[in-house]
Amino acid sequence: MDRRELLKMVAAATGGVVIGGEFFLAGCKNPEAGQSTEFTENDIAFFDEVAETIFPKTSTPGAKEAKVGQFMAVMVNDCYTEENQKAFREGQAAINAACKKMHGHDFMKAAPEHKKAVLVSLDPEIKDYQAKRKEFNKEQDDLEKKAQANGDTNFKRKTMPDHYFIMMKQLTILGYFTSKEGRTGATRYEPVPGKYIGDLDYKKGDKIITGLN
């Protein structure tokens, strides 16, 4: 699977354009990226646990073995705007807070089934956030058109960052399927939970990896 096909798969699995995808495709750094963040070993371990919850080790290697956490750190530094970098970092604290509320301890100390429950619980939050973001962008479109019509050259469009967990899911899939472990251990990705496909094509011998939607 080439990078372009992989981006299409990630977009379909996460319901949106891949954040920083154009720079991933071109293999270059986003000129609007913020200052490089110094991710610690603990940060990388946290990203690995999130990714491993999405792609756990089964008969094929998991995301942790594929070093997806390190991939996330590189992509956030090289391909994300400063605004999205900030949202991504704040997402770590948000996941820990959600885990403490649900299970009484940090995400890193949670049992695998509790980690999965925490990440699945974020789906309604994502849908609500994306709806608000869509409305926000529409308002900005209207304001920009009005400014252009009035000849206002001082108008500066405001932006709203992507949801942190969409970023984490996208980077998990990208990181896994660009790793040696992902390329050799799996050939397809079907999100779970995801939309029902009653006649999913399957060929004998196909390897299917499932993960959180």
Report residues per predicted region.
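N-terminal export signals
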Residues: E5-A26, A111
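Bacterial signal peptide processing site
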Residues: K29-N30
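Post-signal peptide N-terminal segment of mature Sec-exported envelope proteins
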Residues: S36-I54
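Structural motif
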Residues: F39-I44, G62-A63, T159-Y164
